[in-house]
Regions:
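Positively charged, small/polar-rich N-terminal and surface patches that mediate targeting and assembly
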Residues: 1-112
Length: 112
């Protein structure tokens, strides 16, 4: 099993969710986050004063899938989240050793 963590632009969340649903993903976790990479930040004007905003709003989407489904899901996220502009985000894939569904006690693949 693998966990896919995608950091994407907030307005792309619905497209990413739909793309993952088409891959058979039935559940995901979404967290509002802030960060920066090569995009750095931007300046904003507030009450006549200009200031630098270092951290940009993003959303973190986390799903756990069977190892065989990783490439398909990652490709779907890339297609859904890509704008072609700087700041589109990143995807991280990590190994998951164990999953337990608390309600039923199901383990691993059956708990996903």
């Amino acid at each position: 099993m693998k966990q896919i963590t995608a950091i994407v632009k907030p307005f792309k969340l619905e497209e990413v969710r739909e793309a993952l649903a088409e891959c058979g993903v039935t559940g995901l976790t979404v967290t509002e986050v802030k960060g920066f990479g090569r995009q750095k930040g931007h300046t904003e004007l507030y009450r006549g004063a200009e200031y630098v905003v270092d951290f940009l709003p993003k959303v973190k989407v986390e799903v756990v899938v069977k190892s065989a489904d990783v490439d398909h899901c990652v490709d779907a996220i890339v297609r859904a989240a890509r704008t072609g502009k700087i700041g589109d985000g990143k995807i991280f894939v990590t190994a998951v050793e164990r999953v337990v569904r608390i309600r039923t006690g199901e383990l691993d693949d059956t708990a996903i």
